[in-house]
Amino acid sequence: MTTETFVKDIKPGLKNLNLIFIVLETGRVTKTKDGHEVRTCKVADKTGSINISVWDDVGNLIQPGDIIRLTKGYASVFKGCLTLYTGRGGDLQKIGEFCMVYSEVPNFSEPNPEYSTQQAPNKAVQNDSNPSASQPTTGPSAASPASENQNGNGLSAPPGPGGGPHPPHTPSHPPSTRITRSQPNHTPAGPPGPSSNPVSNGKETRRSSKR
């Protein structure tokens, strides 16, 4: 003979559940994309209440106050709430009405903090991984200003060592010397004041001597 399970003993993932319960409420019908009608009903036994999801015509036949035997059901979590389903080959059979001892509390289909805490750490882990990923990004950004500082040091800091800025100036000096060298070549007349006088004097003496 099959053993009956109480509502209080239902856990997520259990299969082949056999229960006897009374229907307390029938919920609104919702249609799936496939055109099926789904109705959520609140049922209870003496240990507590739970929601059961019923499909199509069976949901239309169930009425509050019906005492039903469920065979081969299974339990799963839907939107954070424990829900009872009819499995493959399962059956819902009406065995009576009204005359059954039941308790609405505790309601095992209420959102369970254990399920939320199981989801919360996962989100926390993701949040932890995100800042860790953001930290390395800040690292290279800190390195980039360092490189900028190095570039700035290459230009401004070497004045401390002195030798750094001077080499660029030293190559600038040789061209200036070249220019000065070219200037005397082109400007023997440029400094004519001192040099032209003796030259002119020589010419004058030559002219005077020729005369």
Swiss-Prot record:
Residues 22-92 bind DNA. Its main location: nucleus. Changing residue 117 to A: Loss of phosphorylation by ATM. Residues 110-211 are annotated as: Disordered. Residues 158-174 have a biased composition (Pro residues). The keyword Nucleotidyltransferase does not apply. Pfam families: Ssb-like_OB. GO terms for cellular component: chromosome, telomeric region; cytosol; nucleoplasm; nucleus; site of double-strand break; SOSS complex. Residues 114-154 have a biased composition (Polar residues). GO terms for biological process: DNA damage response; DNA repair; double-strand break repair via homologous recombination; establishment of protein localization to telomere; mitotic G2/M transition checkpoint; positive regulation of telomere capping; response to ionizing radiation. Belongs to the SOSS-B family. SOSS-B1 subfamily. Component of the SOSS complex, composed of SOSS-B (SOSS-B1/NABP2 or SOSS-B2/NABP1), SOSS-A/INTS3 and SOSS-C/INIP. SOSS complexes containing SOSS-B1/NABP2 are more abundant than complexes containing SOSS-B2/NABP1. Directly interacts with ATM, SOSS-A/INTS3 and RAD51. Interacts with INTS7. This is SOSS complex subunit B1. It comes from Homo sapiens (Human). The lineage of its organism: Eukaryota, Metazoa, Chordata, Craniata, Vertebrata. The gene is NABP2.
